[in-house]
């Protein structure tokens, strides 16, 4: 049988295609047999036999629970139950019991919420021990109870919640109102009139059954067209193949209520059931990063599109690690995946973002080609990789993620000098921070070389200035009779030099440099003359010199030995 072919389209359809792939991948459909991409990597193909025999409702629900389940209220309830049980099992002290007071309140409050009540009502006759849930409502678990009773009630509740139908129902209640409704609304289980209805039945009626019926039917005599994929659809007044696109947030008004925008007030902007199902999968195509959903619309090939937005793998295996990930970090991490595909010509990449509130709209960013060229540079990738292994530094009472800050500067076309300045000042008190300052400085110099195409001379001059700073350091410390790694006597000098650099005060900076060289009897390097006429050189040479003066060679011994 001819396979079902899904071609790329706008960003929403592309997100739906990624969502389809993620769903099939997570549920372990057979890639290469049940679904595949064509040789040109432009079309997602699905076996018609697989599609006609598949339970599209079951797949939809299971995929959402697997991918978004770890981030749901349900999982937090399970985590808190296990925490409370652990505290009680260790001993029955008042202090220990009081430490779980807030956790017990969280558990009972969430279990008594309106969404959980309506979900329970739909599955009450299909699960075991429904009285356990009803007991939560009538007699809440609290710290005033005996420890044995708390432990017994929590164990019963945990076993109750771990029933597959309970897990699915309670997870989906959270997923629907926290994730899915950010993208579509007013249809199926998100229609107000269906709030208390069985979620699976509503989805089957509005999405899965129309899809199956559509795939089974011949459309040789159909007269209507899907506005998304141009496929033929029945356009009769009673046809269930005409799906208004208005259920997608921010895409169109309700076409049944507002037809004045169409010729002769005849609405003809409908999508087919297959595209409607793809749109329902859009939340699986976007990736939740911090407090935003993000999607990279790389449409040069399906492999690039799928790999850069592969939600299932990341969330299932690394959810805890990436739950608070920032946008800039996500960009760098996903682009690394794209660069590994070795796409011959990678142009500007549109990135679509949407907030996690229902009323938030779509915003569009562009990762321009010049930024992509920087991020895929081997040396830049090497510096970022090193920063990612130990990204956080403590500066006074605050923590700074150097890795995220440096990427954010790159994608926003900001230089790194403010960050370098902050790190050098912090390294005066905490020596270990200096290595991060060196990496960020190397990244700034490399970025300049890539953007301006000035390679060998720039790098050579910067190394020379760093070595000059290091030689001056050795001379000053030797004159004072101080050990090479003990530089307390230089802290004030380094602090004043970084201040002068940060405000671009060349006169003050050079005054301090001349004083230092006069007292050390060393010759002032020629680089200081060059930097007076060029603001970029002032920063490059100035920070290279200070890093050398601080005791960190811009070039490590290993690099020198390797030529």
What are these regions (language model features)?
Residues 142, 224, 504-505:
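Poly-acidic low-complexity segments
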Residues 127-128, 206-207, 279, 432, ...:
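Generic detector of bulky aromatic hydrophobic side chains
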Residues 21, 60, 68, 74, ...:
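Sequence-level detector for tyrosine residue identity
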Residues 40, 211-213, 222, 229, ...:
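Extended non-catalytic scaffold regions that mediate assembly and binding
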Residues 158-324:
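Basic, glycine-/proline-tolerant helical and adjacent loop/strand elements
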Residues 1-198, 364-376, 530-561:
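Conserved small-residue
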Residues 312-563:
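Intrinsically disordered, low-complexity regulatory regions
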Residues 41-42, 94, 230, 291, ...:
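Intrinsic-disorder/low-complexity loop/linker signature
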């Amino acid at each position: 049988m001819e396979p079902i072919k899904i071609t790329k389209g706008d960003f929403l359809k592309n997100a739906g295609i990624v969502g389809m792939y993620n769903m099939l991948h997570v549920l372990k459909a057979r890639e290469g047999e049940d679904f595949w991409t064509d040789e040109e990597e432009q079309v997602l193909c699905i076996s018609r036999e697989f599609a006609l025999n598949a339970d599209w409702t079951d797949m939809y629900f299971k995929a959402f629970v697997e991918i978004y389940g770890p981030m749901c209220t349900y999982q937090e309830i399970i985590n808190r139950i296990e925490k409370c049980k652990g505290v009680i099992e260790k001993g029955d002290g008042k202090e220990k019991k009081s430490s779980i007071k807030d956790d017990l309140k969280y558990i009972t409050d969430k279990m008594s919420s309106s969404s959980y009540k309506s979900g329970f009502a739909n599955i009450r006759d299909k699960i075991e021990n429904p009285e356990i849930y009803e007991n939560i409502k009538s007699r809440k678990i609290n710290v005033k109870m005996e420890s044995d009773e708390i432990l017994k009630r929590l164990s019963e509740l945990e076993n109750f919640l771990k029933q597959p139908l309970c897990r699915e129902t309670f997870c989906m209640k959270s997923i629907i109102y926290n994730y899915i409704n950010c993208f579509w609304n007013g249809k199926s289980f998100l229609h107000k009139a269906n709030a208390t209805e069985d979620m699976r039945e509503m989805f089957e009626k509005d999405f899965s059954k129309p899809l199956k019926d559509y795939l089974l039917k011949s459309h040789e005599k159909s007269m209507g067209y899907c506005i998304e994929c141009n496929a033929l659809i029945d356009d009769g007044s009673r046809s269930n193949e005409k799906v208004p696109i208005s259920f997608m947030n921010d895409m169109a008004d309700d076409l049944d209520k507002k037809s004045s925008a169409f010729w002769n007030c005849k609405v003809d902007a409908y999508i087919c059931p297959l595209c409607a199902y793809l749109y329902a999968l859009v939340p699986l195509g976007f990736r939740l990063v911090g407090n935003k959903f993000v999607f990279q619309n790389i449409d040069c090939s399906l492999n690039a599109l799928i790999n850069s937005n592969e939600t299932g793998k990341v969330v299932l295996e690394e959810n805890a690690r990436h739950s608070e990930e920032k946008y800039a970090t996500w960009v760098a991490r996903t682009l690394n995946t794209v660069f590994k595909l070795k796409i011959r010509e990678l142009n500007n990449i549109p990135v679509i973002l949407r907030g996690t509130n229902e009323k938030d709209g779509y915003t569009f960013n562009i990762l321009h080609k010049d930024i992509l060229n920087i991020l895929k540079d081997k040396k830049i990738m090497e510096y970022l990789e090193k920063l990612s292994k130990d990204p956080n530094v403590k500066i006074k009472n605050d923590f700074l993620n150097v890795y995220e800050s440096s990427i954010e500067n790159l994608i926003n076309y900001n230089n790194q000098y403010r960050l370098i300045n902050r790190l050098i000042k912090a390294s005066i008190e905490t020596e270990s921070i200096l290595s991060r300052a060196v990496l960020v400085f190397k990244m700034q110099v490399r970025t300049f070389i890539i953007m301006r195409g000035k390679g060998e001379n720039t790098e050579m001059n910067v190394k020379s200035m760093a070595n000059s700073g290091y030689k001056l350091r050795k001379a000053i410390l030797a004159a004072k009779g101080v050990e090479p790694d003990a530089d307390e006597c230089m802290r004030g000098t380094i602090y004043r030099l970084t201040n002068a650099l940060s405000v671009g005060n060349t006169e003050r900076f050079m005054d301090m440099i001349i004083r230092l060289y006069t007292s050390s009897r060393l010759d002032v390097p020629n680089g200081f003359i060059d930097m007076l006429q060029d603001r970029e050189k002032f920063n490059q040479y100035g920070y290279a010199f200070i890093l050398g003066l601080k005791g960190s060679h811009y070039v490590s011994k290993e690099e020198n030995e390797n030529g």
